[in-house]
């Protein structure tokens, strides 16, 4: 039925459908709400056909299958790259870490603090200059991940210090990543990094230095900035990040095979039990 439905649409129309469904895709929405969006998006398909489809699958599963095959958006690239990164058992990985005025798509903490910014074939480079300025202030190595056909174009928007990773899909639908240019080691700005942290994060670092936390965020920030003038606390900052994201990353790694691909980031953030979420959707389907 899946192929039968899609056969009524051109590839271009399917991409537009994927864009619509991806825009506000939310795993916490009720299954019936997502199905209403699917009905709206597949405007050539009868309600009866969609109702029959609902008996075969649940909305998350249908949207995931659609995205993986037809729409290599950021969620899809993240899934494939995380699948690649999780093989390094001693590394800690985080999503959407705030730094300055930017949010890095993927942060990797091993011996080095690494940033990975994803630019898909559907993205432009309008904000890349600002993003790169923030990333080079906060990460020891910075990479940009782009489609293989954009490897040359993107070089006009990044410095020679930035590494380039390309991706492509093979005939089996597997995503192949290749390091086209190595990232050069970069000296970070600890003051900039500390300024990007929340009040609670600053308190944890203060305590890790065996100091007494002060009353306000600004006071704790000034305390740490003063300490940073006297000694190098970069390793302490990196250790803090590793501890901050370790539990979430280990949870995602441990449940990776139970989670639908484009749902990975949501489960990283929430640590929700995938068995419970998807079982709820399956039970709803069984009641139709």
Regions found by a protein language model. Give the residues of each.
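Nuclease-adjacent, charged terminal/linker segments that flank catalytic cores
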Residues: 1-49, 245-288
């Amino acid at each position: 039925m899946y192929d039968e439905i899609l056969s009524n649409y051109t590839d271009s129309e399917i991409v537009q459908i994927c864009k619509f469904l991806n825009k506000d895709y939310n795993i916490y929405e009720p299954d019936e709400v997502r199905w209403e969006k699917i009905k709206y998006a597949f405007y050539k398909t009868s309600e009866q056909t969609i109702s029959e489809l609902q008996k075969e699958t649940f909305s998350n599963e249908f949207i995931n299958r659609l995205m993986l095959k037809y729409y290599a958006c950021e969620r899809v690239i993240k899934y494939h790259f995380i699948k690649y990164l999780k093989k390094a058992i001693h590394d800690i990985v985080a999503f959407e870490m705030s730094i300055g005025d930017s949010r890095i798509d993927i942060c990797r903490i091993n011996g080095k603090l690494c940033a990975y910014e994803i630019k898909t074939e559907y993205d432009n480079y309008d904000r890349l200059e600002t993003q790169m300025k923030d990333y080079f202030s906060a990460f020891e190595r910075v990479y940009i991940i782009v489609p293989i056909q954009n490897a040359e174009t993107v070089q006009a928007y990044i410095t020679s210090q930035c590494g380039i990773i390309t991706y492509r899909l093979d005939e089996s639908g597997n995503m192949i990543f290749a390091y086209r240019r190595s990232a050069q080691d970069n000296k970070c700005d600890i003051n900039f990094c500390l300024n990007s942290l929340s009040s609670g994060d600053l308190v944890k670092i203060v305590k890790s230095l065996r100091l007494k936390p002060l009353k306000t965020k600004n006071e704790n920030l000034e305390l740490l900035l003063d300490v940073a003038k006297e000694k190098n606390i970069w390793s302490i900052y990196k250790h803090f990040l590793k501890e901050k994201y370790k539990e979430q990353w280990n949870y995602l790694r441990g449940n990776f095979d139970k989670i639908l691909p484009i749902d990975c980031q949501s489960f990283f953030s929430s640590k929700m039990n995938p068995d419970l979420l998807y079982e709820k959707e399956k039970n709803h389907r069984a009641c139709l």
